[in-house]
Amino acid sequence: MDTMGRHIITELWECNPDKLNDIDYIERLFVDAALRSGAEVREVAFHKFAPHGVSGVVIISESHLTIHSFPEHGYASVDVFTCGDRIDPATASQYIAEGLDAKVREDVKLERGMGPIRVPEAQVAISK
């Protein structure tokens, strides 16, 4: 194994604001994303803010998936971190982006735990 973990930091823009503000939808989306990527879900915690926004985490045996949503801006900040090489964090990240109807997606992929972090250029996908 070349790395102890893989981390995808995802910026999602022009998302469906109703989905970004629906705690039940986001929780299901994140649990499904974890399961689709082959992860084992351990704990789930989500919080709905007033007047809008959701933050949450799905703890998986292999690490975690998190979100902070800003429906008023059509924006979500998503992290998917997986230890080892059995789970592909890109599968979960893509599923989440599609589930939130993101029109613009920016990913930064990091390898973790093997020395200094090398931060690559962000990869931007626009689906307008």
Curated annotation (Swiss-Prot):
Entry annotation: catalytic residues: 63, 68, 83
InterPro entries: AdoMetDC_C, AdoMetDC_fam_prok, AdoMetDC_N, S-AdoMet_deCO2ase_core, S-AdoMet_deCOase_pro-enz
Assembly mode: Heterotetramer of two alpha and two beta chains arranged as a dimer of alpha/beta heterodimers.
Protein name: S-adenosylmethionine decarboxylase proenzyme
GO cellular component: a single term: cytosol
Family per record: Belongs to the prokaryotic AdoMetDC family. Type 1 subfamily.
Keywords: Autocatalytic cleavage, Decarboxylase, Lyase, Polyamine biosynthesis, Pyruvate, S-adenosyl-L-methionine, Schiff base, Spermidine biosynthesis, Zymogen
Catalysed reaction equations from the record: S-adenosyl-L-methionine + H(+) = S-adenosyl 3-(methylsulfanyl)propylamine + CO2
EC number(s) per entry: 4.1.1.50
Cofactors (names): pyruvate
Cofactor note: Binds 1 pyruvoyl group covalently per subunit.
Pfam family, one: AdoMet_dc
Any one GO biological process: spermidine biosynthetic process
Source lineage: Bacteria, Bacillati, Bacillota, Bacilli, Bacillales
Post-translational modification: Is synthesized initially as an inactive proenzyme. Formation of the active enzyme involves a self-maturation process in which the active site pyruvoyl group is generated from an internal serine residue via an autocatalytic post-translational modification. Two non-identical subunits are generated from the proenzyme in this reaction, and the pyruvate is formed at the N-terminus of the alpha chain, which is derived from the carboxyl end of the proenzyme.
SUPFAM superfamilies given in the database record: S-adenosylmethionine decarboxylase (SSF56276)
